[in-house]
């Protein structure tokens, strides 16, 4: 698998064991790898792909996704809201501090493709 050899070359398996709280990888919006440390899950941290977040955490996604910058506010926000695909979903409950980084890797092969991030909840840090 292309991603596995890239992960190995970048030293991700070792970093995941020693210094990352979670790792995700997507190839053209398809999830090829995802993990999160159990202690973060116990604190209520959610780190998954967008499709899983919509299925398993619909209430949180509906509450926040596309709310800070609504699609009607700007043409690029509207475009993003209309055609988004893939992506990582990170939710850190209010007051929780994530001490170890969460790392997402994306490989986009389509020319002109882009990615857009959204940050959720007050007084949370990653």
Provide a role label for each language-model segment:
Residues 1-126:
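Glycine-rich and polybasic anion-binding loops at the starts of cofactor/ligand-binding domains
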């Amino acid at each position: 698998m292309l991603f596995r050899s890239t992960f190995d070359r970048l030293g991700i398996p070792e970093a995941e064991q020693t210094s990352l709280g979670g790792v995700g990888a997507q190839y053209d919006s398809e999830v090829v790898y995802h993990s999160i440390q159990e202690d973060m899950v116990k604190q209520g941290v959610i780190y998954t792909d967008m499709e899983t977040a919509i299925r398993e955490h619909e209430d949180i996604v509906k509450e926040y996704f596309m709310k800070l910058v609504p699609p009607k506010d700007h043409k690029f926000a509207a475009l993003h809201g209309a055609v988004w695909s893939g992506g990582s979903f990170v939710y850190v409950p209010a007051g929780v501090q994530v001490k170890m980084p969460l790392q997402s890797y994306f490989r986009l092969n389509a020319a002109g493709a882009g990615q857009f991030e959204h940050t959720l909840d007050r007084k949370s840090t990653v």
